[in-house]
Amino acid sequence: MVKVENISKTFESRRKKVVAVDSLSFSAEPKSIFGLLGPNGAGKTTTLRIISTLLKPDRGKTSVMGFDSVVQPTEVRKRIGFLTSDMKLSGNLTPKELLRFYGELNHMRDTDISKRTKELSEYLDMNDFLDKRIGKLSTGMKQKAAIAVSLIHDPEVIIFDEPTNGLDILTARTVTDFLKDYRNQGKTIIISTHIMTVAKKLCNRVGIIFKGRLVEDDTLEGLYEKFGEDNLEDVFFKIADREGVIELV
């Protein structure tokens, strides 16, 4: 389980302060996918980085499986698989070599690394390029490799920032099907996205975020009932209009 409790984060430069996350709270349960849905610059990535121990909040706290992300970052990292929207992989290595490297970083045994590599390669349809250099792979292949790397240690909590961004239809389908399977294995999954179809296909619950504030947190059915609509796009635009940010979407 993941708990986010009243977190805020402000970034400062010489000219101005930018409030990236403003008093934001939500929780994500096992065997579910929670989606943070919002336009670019809404605060989705900052929120995920705070949960994943890569940033510290100015206020509030986050916890993963009962471990505080600030106080117990090592324990949190053991239990999460985090995929950034701009994850960079070494172009000189192969996916197989990367998986071994990250498996060793997670103190896995050789036999477990080999077994897990085989499982992930089959799950993500990677066998044809497992021994090819990352620098020679397509965008979709690189994304699959990045997903596999983030999951090599079989984490209990999965946090993916824009997991289908920039992917072709077939690769995006592979990724969404994979996440559904993982959810059904009892994992806690949080994703960020600005793509409505991804949220509709995957999420048990969505949090809609504008200007760093979580303005709605509900099931899709709950949102449809509340706003008198039967699709997520119309709900989203009604909320954007209400919040005065319709120009952003």
Model-found features: residue ranges?
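A short, flexible loop at the N-terminus of ABC-type nucleotide-binding domains that lies
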Residues: M1-V4, T10-S23, P30, P73
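Conserved ABC ATPase signature
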Residues: R133-L137
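Conserved ABC ATPase "signature" region
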Residues: R100, E104, T111-F129
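Walker A (P-loop) phosphate-binding loop of ABC-type ATPase nucleotide-binding domains
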Residues: P39-G43
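Catalytic Walker B motif of ABC-type/P-loop ATPase nucleotide-binding domains
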Residues: I158-E162
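ABC ATPase "signature
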Residues: D217-D218
